[in-house]
Amino acid sequence: SAPTGTGKTAAYLLPVLQHLLDFPRKKSGPPRILILTPTRELAMQVADHARELAANTHLDIATITGGVAYMNHAEVFSENQDIVVATTGRLLQYIKEENFDCRAVETLILDEADRMLDMGFAQDIEHIAGETRWRNQTMLFSATLEGEAIKDFAERLLEDPVEVSATPSTRERKKIHQWYYRADNLEHKLELLKHLLKQEDALRTIVFVRKRERVHELAEMLRNAGINNCYLEGEMAQIKRTEGIKRLTDG
């Protein structure tokens, strides 16, 4: 179990990268490391982190996610990748179509397994685990290992596992200031939101809403109020999602 901010991504990437370098294969082949994530954004983030850590090495890293045209995954089909970071849905599609070879996978890593369970991906993950049954190692990472669902899931996938718990640091939390605002009604809430977003120190802000339809409505309202914004929601093409994240990152 490793809560957000404990460095779990580097904790599993560094050992597998070192393993690939210590035991190189004689010729190119299917991926040796398979990392599953619940969302496209996390898959891209993990892959970018892996590329940074693997800079100046011969290791190849690719992603397989939904929202991307079939032809853009040609690099994975070429059987010249060491690490593949994927979301379950698109990967399972390629496995069923026999476009992805699982037989060389040595290590299967499940990042944010609790979220994948919450999103209903348990059956897909077990199917993928069955396709990689020749693997030597399985790693499961979760914000918490409490609850019967995640425990039962871990027992089905892991064989005699070693449990490691990372304690989150409280040092960084002290830098976070939190406020709670009570609005009288929807109109008041919108005016309050616009007021807060127009403050000088609101340089980069993320606003969460409950429904996808509300995302579009709120984005338009803010634009009409002169507040520059972009939105992200699940039905967007991946190129649009990536563009939105880049705009937020660049400010």
Where are these regions (language model features)?
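Conserved helicase RecA-like core
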Residues: 1-251
